Design a protein with these regions (language model features):
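Terminal-region recognition feature
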Residues: 12-244
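Compositionally biased low-complexity segments, especially N-terminal hydrophobic helices
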Residues: 8-9
């Protein structure tokens, strides 16, 4: 019976040319040092990877190792953000970034983004961690990077942000609502305005676009193709396969 190994990291024995990590090392790091419960990890992996996760088998000098493809890619410092952004997702991605930094602070980390966005607060946690860790962060949009996903896409290291040919990137103003006493509604409205200003400043900083233009464009859903995203400054390169 196959066991679902969502974030299992297995060290390549003897022949590892780069610094690798031992089996279950990220799992232990997330639980013991980042305070992420095993239940949260299980829920995250079940929602993200699902039951159709492909497994690969690698022949090693001393054994044969089986792991899911996402764990194998993480060994190459590749993180997938392929779902909506909430607190649980943010906790895992932040832990992955910090873990990979602890393994090797000089090698780049790549984040593949295919996300419709989600919680602004959770997304800002990922954003701040991306800016905090020492390795350069390469971002690649595969499919869609919308709302908070677009903010994370443009927040990669300058010169290392890319999108596939038919990807779409969308920015807009933050959404929110409130109910209750008028004073509470006013408090929420002020907070949304603060978040709006903060997000627009982040996008302006990473794209080089004037803050006023971001304010105007993001008033409603502002969709961009990969080429348009490059011209806008959201990415630096459009990735086109050799078969194109």
């Amino acid at each position: 019976t196959q066991k679902f190994l969502s974030i299992t990291i297995i060290k390549i024995l003897m022949f590892a040319p780069k610094k690798m990590f031992k089996k279950d090392e990220f799992y232990k790091y997330a639980v013991k040092h980042r305070g992420i419960s095993s239940l949260t990890l299980h829920r995250y992996q079940s929602r993200w990877y699902g039951s159709m996760t492909p497994y690969i088998i690698e022949e090693r000098q001393l054994n044969v190792a089986q792991m899911d493809v996402f764990s194998r890619l993480m060994m190459d410092r590749i993180i997938f953000l392929g779902t909506g952004i909430d607190d649980q997702v943010a906790n895992i991605v932040e832990a992955q970034l910090l873990f990979l930094e602890s393994v090797d602070a000089k090698r780049d980390i790549t984040i593949y983004i295919n996300s419709p966005g989600g919680s602004v607060y959770a997304g800002l946690g990922i954003y701040d961690t991306m800016q905090f860790v020492k390795p350069d962060i390469s971002t690649v949009c595969t499919g869609i990077a919308a709302s908070m996903g677009a903010v994370l896409q443009c927040a990669g290291t300058k010169g290392k942000r890319a999108a596939l040919k038919h990807a779409r990137i969308m920015i807009h103003q933050p959404l929110g609502g409130a109910e209750g006493p008028a004073s509470d509604i006013e408090i929420t409205a002020r907070e949304i305005q603060k978040l709006k200003k903060e997000l627009y400043e982040i996008i302006a900083h990473h794209t080089g676009q004037p803050y006023k233009k971001i304010w105007q464009d993001a008033d409603r859903d502002f969709w961009m193709t990969a080429e348009e995203s490059k011209a806008y400054g959201m990415i630096d390169e459009v990735l086109i396969g050799k078969k194109s």
